[in-house]
Curated annotation (Swiss-Prot):
Gene3D superfamilies: HUPs
GO cellular component: cytoplasm
Catalytic activity: cytidine(34) in elongator tRNA(Met) + acetate + ATP = N(4)-acetylcytidine(34) in elongator tRNA(Met) + AMP + diphosphate
EC number: 6.3.4.-
An MF annotation (GO) of this entry: tRNA binding
Top-level taxon in the UniProt lineage: Bacteria
Function: Catalyzes the formation of N(4)-acetylcytidine (ac(4)C) at the wobble position of elongator tRNA(Met), using acetate and ATP as substrates. First activates an acetate ion to form acetyladenylate (Ac-AMP) and then transfers the acetyl group to tRNA to form ac(4)C34.
Protein name, per record: tRNA(Met) cytidine acetate ligase
Taxon lineage: Bacteria, Bacillati, Mycoplasmatota, Mycoplasmoidales, Metamycoplasmataceae
Residues where ATP binds: 6-19, 100, 157, 182
Length: 298
């Protein structure tokens, strides 16, 4: 018998230690498997530490096994990220999954997923209608779910957790899902005792501040950020035609022309802000930038 945790550990911090200890207490004797993103994470960024370094510290703090989630899933939107993670958990014959959640109501996740499954054709119709209106996929999906069930999830870990549960329900996986309350808001700019969000810890690391109160990971020098590669990205965009850019993964619907139009922006953040729109979320733009830098094509 085993239980899985899906994680990025970007970086591994006290909240993750709490989660592993919580699992050990609630599920004694169960082997803990971590499904961990590799060197790149879901938002299209470079992980703050290598996969091997994050794997090592997870094992040191109580995980029994760490499995790498393939790049093609780890660097994608929530529904694709969840698809890859749950397929891996199922292939490993792990029978339980646990995740952090803002609402912490697993029965609601399951019930809503079942309603959507029973009304899948109607859901797909609403989804297509919303996409035609120019909405991003996450927004279009949320509104389609809301129209069918009367409910939708707004908080990031609820959204991701719901995608996990949907994969279990839609694929009839023999996996039982559990959730628990998070120790801290994922992007809070304020710590709570010994806990701080991954976003805040990364910010502190890049500012050269001491983070030892919040994470056991040691950072002797500032990690490379995707922002540091903006000049390389600019060079590629300048040297490629719009037609050539369309060969890269996720580049479609004219986004290559927006990239060409705004490539003179002075910084990575300025560029993302200019290209960001109702249809193109900042997360999607960041993933495309990563794919272009890595040469990932369709």
């Amino acid at each position: 018998m085993a239980i899985a945790i899906i994680a990025e550990y970007n970086p591994f911090h006290n909240g993750h230690i709490y989660q592993i200890n919580y699992v050990k207490e609630k599920f004694p004797g169960e082997k803990i498997h971590i499904i961990l993103s590799g060197n790149y994470v879901q938002r299209g960024e470079i992980a703050i530490a290598s996969f091997e370094k994050r794997k090592k510290i997870a094992l040191e703090y109580g995980a029994d096994y760490v499995h790498e989630l393939e790049f093609e899933y780890a660097s994608q939107a929530a529904h694709i990220f969840a698809k890859g993670a749950l397929a891996k958990i199922n292939s490993l014959q792990i029978d339980k999954l646990i995740f952090g959640s803002e609402t912490n109501d697993i029965n609601e996740f399951i019930n809503i997923a079942k309603i959507i499954k029973d009304n899948k054709s109607q859901y797909q119709l609403f989804l297509k209608e919303n996409l035609k209106k120019g909405l991003s996929f996450p927004k279009a999906s949320s509104l389609a779910s809301q129209k069918i069930t009367g409910k939708y999830f707004q908080m990031p870990n609820d959204i991701l957790g719901f995608e996990y549960v949907k994969q279990i329900i839609f694929n009839n996986y023999k996996i039982t899902a559990f959730c628990h309350t998070r120790t801290n808001d994922y992007k809070s700019d304020k710590p709570s005792g010994k806990y701080a969000s991954s976003t805040l810890i990364r910010k502190m690391i890049f500012e050269g501040k001491d983070v030892s109160k919040y994470t056991p990971m040691i950072f002797e020098k500032k990690p490379i950020r995707i922002e540091d590669l903006y000049f390389d990205f600019q060079t590629i965009i300048f040297n490629k035609t719009a037609q050539e850019l369309r060969q890269f993964k996720l580049v479609s619907e004219g986004i290559e022309n927006l990239f060409k139009k705004h490539i003179n922006e002075k910084s990575y953040d300025d560029f993302v802000a200019k290209v960001n729109s109702k249809r193109y979320t900042s997360s999607r733009i960041k993933r495309i930038i990563l794919y272009i830098l890595l040469g990932i094509k369709n």
